[in-house]
């Protein structure tokens, strides 16, 4: 394969989604698309990375880190449903449209709504999970509170008690990361550097809230829905947002973070860290 062809294929990219049997909507979790047409979309835009068998072993997969998704397993990292459940069509559509920042998965916003739904329907034929399971129910997202200095302070305490084992000081340098971590596909992974102001999927405090609540499927990133209250997760989200140049992170919010005392200077988060 020539260098030009490889570059071209990388630009075309690959999808990270999933969807229902080759007869369009057959199956419990199927999207309202045509799987036959979706296969044609897949072969044009996705096969270079995700492979002819949708196994993540396309011609340019070797240059991709993380590796392209193997759709046959029915595991999708980014979902608005709780950990372990299949994603909604809207979840998959978001990944197709926006891509995954910092990876080889580019945005496919130029695809029509029908093309996106069709390719989702095709990918849902590639895993038996879609024939027996429906998508998970999206987590409830309460209205975002106005961040305050007190909330950001509490957010750091909660972060240190619940997140620092992997994320460390926010740069992904926690003790678990130092030891080495792997995902469900056996690939080495590192926790996100939250000071960069953007994650693969997350852009806003609302996105951070969803990821903290739902976790990331196929990785050691757990859900916190049974551990923290919605109020506490918002506090963590605003603290993380204050760490870097996240979308809608205001100068005031960043000042709150800058004014925090050094780690360990105050009382650590105690029993109320865990949802009662």
Residue ranges and their predicted role:
Residues 22-41, 130-159, 247-256, 265-275:
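Electrostatic cytochrome c docking/interface patches
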Residues 1-4:
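N-terminal secretory signal peptides that target proteins for export/translocation
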Residues 53, 59-61, 176-178:
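Conserved catalytic-core motifs of eukaryotic protein kinase domains, centered on the activation segment
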Residues 7-18:
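Bacterial N-terminal signal peptides
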Residues 32-43, 55, 85, 102, ...:
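Short sequence/structural segments immediately N-terminal
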Residues 51-56, 99, 168-172, 215:
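Periodic glycine anchor positions in long extracellular repeat architectures
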Residues 32-51, 147-172, 179-183, 236:
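Sequence/structural segment immediately N-terminal to covalent heme-attachment motifs in c-type
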Residues 62-110, 116-123, 180-245:
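Extracytoplasmic electron-transfer domains, predominantly the class I c-type cytochrome c fold
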């Amino acid at each position: 394969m020539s260098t030009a062809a490889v570059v071209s294929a990388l630009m075309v990219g690959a999808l990270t989604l999933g969807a229902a049997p080759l007869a369009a909507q057959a199956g419990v979790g199927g999207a309202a698309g045509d799987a036959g047409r979706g296969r044609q979309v897949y072969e044009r835009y996705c096969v270079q990375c995700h492979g002819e068998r949708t196994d993540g072993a396309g011609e340019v997969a070797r240059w991709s880190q993380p590796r392209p998704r193997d759709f046959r397993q029915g595991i999708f990292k980014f979902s608005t449903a709780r950990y372990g459940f299949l994603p909604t069509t809207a979840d998959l559509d978001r990944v197709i449209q926006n891509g995954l920042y910092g990876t080889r998965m580019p945005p496919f916003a130029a695809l029509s709504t029908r093309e996106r739904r069709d390719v989702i329907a095709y990918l849902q034929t590639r895993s038996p999970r879609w024939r027996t399971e429906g998508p998970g129910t999206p987590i409830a997202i309460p209205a975002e509170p106005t961040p305050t200095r007190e909330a950001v302070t509490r957010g750091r305490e909660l972060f240190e008690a619940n997140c620092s084992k992997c994320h460390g000081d926010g740069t992904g340098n926690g003790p678990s990361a130092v030891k080495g971590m792997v995902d469900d596909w056996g690939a080495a992974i590192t926790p996100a550097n939250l000071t960069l102001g953007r994650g693969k999927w997350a852009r806003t405090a609302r996105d951070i809230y969803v990821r903290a609540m739902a976790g990331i499927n196929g990785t050691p990133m757990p859900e916190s829905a049974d551990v923290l209250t919605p109020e506490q997760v918002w506090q963590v989200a605003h603290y993380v947002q204050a760490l870097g140049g996240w979308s809608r992170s205001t100068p005031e919010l960043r000042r709150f973070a800058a004014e925090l005392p050094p780690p360990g200077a105050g009382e650590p988060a105690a029993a109320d860290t865990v949802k009662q």
